């Protein structure tokens, strides 16, 4: 259990390091390359599926750092790439079984995609980068926690 937690943290930190090490500091929406958001989205989805593979599983629910990955992706990589990664992670979640938790994850993904996109439209006008990242992270974690609470109360 602790090993999976450390593997997830390591995967997240390595993906952040490699992104900032090998990318141009110009934001994606200002670049001319149209294929770059798709490439970054596929990379985000691939990292999310790897994190899901090494997640901690309790009662069929996978616990990992995908929420953090999505918050960082929405803030620093861009909306289009993060949404592509979110779709890829959601499809990858169905590889682990077609159960009610997978469909709950689909609903969470739709909400996180819509709310994070709206937040990134309004937050930069009022807050600095760190505050925006904290708000996105809290949104993702609270949404996941609330959905997990609803799912667990319906089981009993």
Please provide the spans of the model-predicted regions.
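Generic transmembrane alpha-helix motif of multi-pass integral membrane proteins
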Residues: 65-82, 116
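Structural signal for the C-terminal ends of transmembrane alpha-helices
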Residues: 17-28, 77, 118-125
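Aromatic-enriched hydrophobic runs in primary sequence
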Residues: 14-15, 19-22, 74-81, 85-89
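Hydrophobic transmembrane alpha-helices
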Residues: 1-70, 81-156
């Amino acid at each position: 259990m602790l090993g999976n937690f450390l593997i997830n943290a390591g995967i997240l930190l390595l993906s952040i390091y490699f992104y900032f090490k090998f990318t141009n500091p110009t934001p994606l929406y200002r670049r001319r390359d149209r294929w770059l958001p798709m490439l970054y989205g596929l990379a985000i989805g691939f990292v999310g599926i790897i994190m899901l593979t090494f997640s901690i599983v309790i009662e069929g629910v996978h616990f990992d750092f995908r929420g953090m990955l999505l918050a960082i992706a929405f803030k620093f990589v861009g909306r289009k790439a993060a949404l592509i990664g979110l779709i890829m992670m959601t499809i990858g979640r169905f590889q682990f079984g077609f159960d009610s938790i997978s469909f709950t994850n689909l609903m969470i993904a739709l909400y996180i995609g819509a709310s994070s996109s709206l937040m990134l439209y309004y937050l930069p006008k009022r807050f600095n980068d760190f505050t925006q990242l904290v708000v996105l992270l809290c949104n993702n974690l609270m949404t996941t926690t609330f959905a997990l609470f609803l799912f667990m109360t319906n089981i009993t």
